[in-house]
Regions:
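Short acidic-glycine-tyrosine-enriched beta hairpin
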Residues: 70-85
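A short, N-terminal "cap"/entry segment at the start of jelly-roll beta-barrel domains
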Residues: 1-33, 113-131
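Conserved short histidine dyad/triad with adjacent acidic residue
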Residues: 36-51
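Short beta-strand His + acidic residue motifs that chelate non-heme Fe in jelly-roll/DSBH
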Residues: 48, 66-67, 83, 89-95
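A generic "binding-loop/recognition-motif" signal
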Residues: 52-53, 71, 87-88, 97
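Glycine- and acidic-residue-biased ligand/ion/polar-headgroup-sensing regions
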Residues: 54-55, 59-64
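A short hydrophobic beta-strand segment most commonly corresponding to one strand
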Residues: 82, 96-114
Length: 131
């Protein structure tokens, strides 16, 4: 597999004030990993949700307030949090500058169950050829 040029991947708007760039998923040939960057404006991030697999949330730049079950923590650049499979979690940007986080999930597609059912729960899933 040739090297991946991450900047060639498009930025996607996931919700107001949150842009996402997929770095690796089933769409790029991954079988067991999904990795993406998110760029979140002040006060914004990811609403409460769970995944069926483990996730690592790493702060690349900025400061995040992360909720993991009932625990709230402040996470800074070059720090990460392991989110166990099935654990409720969320995060938000608590600084004025844009928060850059990297999420790595132990699955090749993004799947989540959100408290807010209006959120899109599945992304980067390959299409099935029906021909």
């Amino acid at each position: 597999m040739p090297p991946m040029i991450h900047d060639d991947q498009p930025l996607e708007k996931w919700r107001d004030g949150v842009m996402t760039r997929m770095r690796m998923s089933a769409l790029l040939g991954s079988k067991q990993l999904c990795v993406f960057d998110q760029f979140c404006d002040h006060g914004l991030g990811a609403p409460t949700h769970i995944h069926a697999v483990e996730e690592i949330l790493e702060v690349i730049d900025g400061v995040a307030e992360i909720w993991l079950e009932k625990e709230k923590m402040i996470v800074r650049a070059n720090q990460s949090v392991l989110i166990p499979a099935g654990a409720k979690h969320s995060f938000r940007n608590i600084e004025q500058k844009v928060l850059h986080v990297r999420a790595s999930l132990a699955a090749s597609i993004f799947e989540a169950s959100y408290e807010d059912r209006a959120e899109i729960s599945r992304r980067w899933s390959p299409s099935f050829d029906t021909a």
